[in-house]
UniProtKB/Swiss-Prot annotation:
The basic functional RuBisCO is composed of a large chain homodimer in a 'head-to-tail' conformation. In form I RuBisCO this homodimer is arranged in a barrel-like tetramer with the small subunits forming a tetrameric 'cap' on each end of the 'barrel'. It comes from Acidithiobacillus ferrooxidans (strain ATCC 23270 / DSM 14882 / CIP 104768 / NCIMB 8455) (Ferrobacillus ferrooxidans (strain ATCC 23270)). Its EC number is 4.1.1.39. Its cofactor is Mg(2+). This is Ribulose bisphosphate carboxylase large chain 2.
Length: 473
């Protein structure tokens, strides 16, 4: 009689991948998914299916399961929670053994956690809400090339947020006119100017010419002001080889900082560029273009707090974070949550900010959040309150739209920033008393006075689409 070694056929996922009594290990990578199951699929089966498809499972029993220690390598759904106010979906907590993932590879992590499982028929919608990376995995990743303190030392700027501006119009300027716009902003008081995310090397402005004219602007502004200046030179390119070519040229001409679009450019390219920046003493600004395709739908995709953690592991010294008060999507408490994720060494679970797990970053440097998108001088008190000193406040139209020109717009923002910081340091509640603080400063700054008059009626009062589920236990 033949020996039967395994039971062929399809089994319920819950039989193998649902373990409500599992004790989480310090070395496990933990994930929480918001799952909207198909009709007729119960919660335990849906959670187990996600655990299986994002780890070792397939749709049927296979004999090769006997050739490995499946019980060690599998993902385990270990807890289910209600989503407050929405009975169509639920939270599933899943633990993955660290050995499922290649060391230092955010590419490999995402290939499992947000790979084929997102097309799985057992679920109608699936969203990765948060991930806990154990310190054992964090230490395998390079992280930010330099971090906040090293950037302050390189740029010789302390005690306040840094001030930036994205050059507009974002497309269409010649390289010479682009450099002129940078110079006017930098001499007016900005610390940085910036390429926009889609400025690469187009027919109207090739990258090398842009780099040359921008560096001329930086050097001239530094000579006039006595301050260190910079411009985020976007090295995002069609191929990694071309990206490194542009980065090398930026280093050759003396640029202190370059820029990369980490989602459209790719996580592999970003990690490589971060390593290059670390080795070559170059700061790295990260733009999040395409993030809203992934994170804005509250039921399907990847929450931005996860994209933030992935970026900190992959590497970047700056990351766009939204503004709360500007034109772009961003719930206040959720934004404060991912700002903490960027900067702090240890973040406690805080459901009021959407943080599901403790996260220990060890000695990994922090990332400076960048507030950008539809902001102007009237927003300065709120921005300084929300973001604090270790941030970049970046005004594009709020600088270049000044009736007196770029330099005046930069001067208005610099005066507003320093007035808010000085008032805050005296104990003034600047978010409440901001109007009085700015009005007093404007008595000595005609540039600020005109800026306040120009933008006094400009507000972006659309409701946030992706709101926190506030009634967590």
């Amino acid at each position: 009689m033949a020996v039967k070694t395994y039971n062929a056929g399809v089994k319920d996922y819950r039989n193998t991948y649902w373990e409500p009594d599992y004790s989480v290990k310090d070395t496990d990578i933990l994930a929480v998914f918001k799952i909207t199951p198909q009709a007729g699929v119960d919660r335990e089966e849906a959670a187990a299916a996600v655990a299986a498809e994002s780890s070792t499972g397939t749709w049927t029993t296979v004999w090769t399961d006997l050739l490995t220690d499946l019980d060690y390598y599998k993902g385990r759904a270990y807890r289910i929670e209600d989503v407050p106010g929405d009975d169509t979906c639920f939270y599933a907590f899943i633990a993955y053994p660290i050995d499922l993932f290649e060391e230092g590879s955010v590419v490999n992590v995402f290939t499992s956690l947000v790979g084929n499982v997102f097309g799985f028929k057992a679920v109608r919608a699936l969203r990765l809400e948060d991930v806990r990376f154990p310190i054992a995995y964090v230490k395998t990743c390079g992280g930010p090339p330099h971090g906040i303190q090293v950037e302050r030392d390189i740029m010789n700027k302390y005690g306040r947020p840094l001030l930036g501006c994205t050059i507009k119009p974002k497309l269409g300027l010649s390289a010479k006119n682009y450099g002129r716009a940078c110079y006017e902003g930098l001499r007016g008081g900005l610390d940085f100017t910036k390429d926009d995310e889609n400025v690469n090397s187009q027919p109207f402005m090739r990258w090398r010419q842009r780099f040359d004219f921008v560096m001329e602007a930086i050097q001239k502004a530094e000579a006039e002001t006595g301050e260190r200046k910079g411009h985020y030179l976007n090295v995002t390119a069609p191929t990694p080889e071309e990206m490194y070519k542009r980065a090398e040229y930026a280093k050759e001409i003396g640029a202190p900082i370059i820029m990369h679009d980490y989602i459209t450019g790719g996580f592999c390219a970003n990690t490589g560029l971060a390593n290059w920046c670390r080795d070559n003493g170059m700061l790295l600004h990260i733009h999040r273009a395409m993030h809203a395709v992934l994170d804005r739908n509250p039921h399907h995709g990847i929450h931005f707090r996860v994209l933030t953690k992935i970026l900190r592991l992959s590497g970047g010294d700056h990351l766009h974070s939204g503004t709360v008060v500007g034109k772009l999507e961003g719930d206040r408490e959720a934004t404060l949550g991912w700002i903490d994720i960027m900067r702090d060494r240890f973040i406690k679970e805080d459901r009021s900010r959407g943080i599901f797990f403790d996260q220990d970053w060890g000695s990994m440097p922090g990332v400076m959040p960048v507030a950008s998108g539809g902001i102007h001088v009237w927003h300065m008190p709120a921005l300084v309150t929300i973001f604090g000193d270790d941030s970049v406040l970046q005004f594009g139209g709020g600088t270049l739209g000044h009736p007196w020109g770029n330099a005046a717009g930069a001067a208005a923002n610099r005066v507003a920033l320093e007035a808010c910081v000085e008032a805050r340091n005296r104990g003034v509640a600047i978010e409440k008393e901001g109007k009085a603080v700015l009005t007093e400063a404007a008595k000595h700054s005609p540039e600020l006075k005109i800026a306040m008059e120009t933008w006094k009626e400009i507000k972006f009062e659309f409701d946030t689409v992706d709101k926190l589920d506030v009634a967590h236990k």
